[in-house]
Amino acid sequence: MRTFLIGTLLAAAAAAPRESPPHPMTGYADMADLALAAPVAAHVRTTDVIQLKKEQAVGVPSGVFRFYVAADVVSLIRSPQPLPARISYVVDLPAGPAGKPPRLVKGADYLILAAPVAGHLGEVRLIAPNAQLSYSTAEEDRLRGILHEAMSATPPPRITGIGRAFHVPGSLPGESETQIFLQTSDGRPVSLSILRRPGETPRWSVALSEIVDAAAAPPAHNTLLWYRLACSLPPSLPVQSIPEGATDGDAAAIRADYRLVLDSLGPCGRTRARS
């Protein structure tokens, strides 16, 4: 009985995710950039790691090392097609301290964002040099959350620009409403509404249809809608967005309300180069 229990515990330990040592969590914008561009997302566990020789790593810049990785698929999070239980890929990693190759070990867990390799069912290609992420349950939860929103019936569209903006003063001093129309990749109507009332904190909301709900709250940080806005809106309102004939006061009010939205959204937080 004791031998059976020990064997059971060892098997359970082997199957459990092996989280990497504590490391800074991948920022939401960086994770979203990768997740939205990758046809394949998976939690893998390495079974073999081989550093390739220089002649096998053509095009790899100085200070970067290329590795061949074989890995078991622990969990297939997203894929356009089934994958075998074991896959392989190559990853390019920067040198570690003193210019030495970074240490990759067998049995390490990673999240990978990749694409299938045509004609090679067991091979995938990382969509970016930084598309192998150290595994943690928090990282996986963030990845799954982004993909869940992206695959919903009506995900927030990609923002491609800013259209016209309009400002209407209210009947009371300090009362006004500004509406800023956004351009999107699929043509869906998206607009920002900013309301000001005397003695109240200015409020703004975003509408993903032609119906504007003035009572709606701004998007929560680290959501797909927040990402679409915070990482796509330009730092200042384009001149052509101000209507012809707008007074200097109305133009200034529109710009101030646009700045209010940007300040509320905060920085995008992207730190990784986009592929």
What positions do the PLM features span?
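Sec-dependent N-terminal signal peptides
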Residues: 3-13
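Transition segments tied to proteolytic processing and entry into folded domains
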Residues: 15-275
